[in-house]
């Protein structure tokens, strides 16, 4: 199976939200996902973006994602925080 990694684009947000819901179900907390597709689109398009997302694809099928965001540490400076890494 060939797997490719790419930056998520607006057209990927419905599939991303489905994967987020799958992850929440796996963690036995499906009711905790309050996020909407509209919120994902808005926050991804913010300047600067509220998060960054890479998706793993095999053909047209999205197999997983890595969602991250930048933060700042008074001890270390700029950091990248990986919020979730999920692969089916």
Where are these regions (language model features)?
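A conserved beta-turn-beta hairpin within the catalytic core of GNAT-like acetyltransferases
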Residues: 71-82
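A cytosolic small-molecule/anion-sensing beta-strand core signal
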Residues: 58, 83
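Conserved beta-strand in the GNAT
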Residues: 55, 61-69
């Amino acid at each position: 199976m060939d797997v490719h990694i790419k930056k998520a684009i607006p057209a990927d947000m419905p599939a991303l939200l489905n994967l987020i819901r799958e992850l929440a179900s796996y963690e036995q907390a499906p009711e905790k996902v309050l996020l909407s597709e509209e919120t994902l689109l808005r926050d991804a398009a913010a300047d600067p973006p509220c998060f960054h997302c890479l998706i793993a694809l095999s053909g047209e099928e999205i197999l997983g994602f890595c969602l991250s965001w930048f933060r700042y540490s008074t001890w270390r400076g700029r950091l990248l925080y990986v919020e979730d890494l999920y692969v089916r």
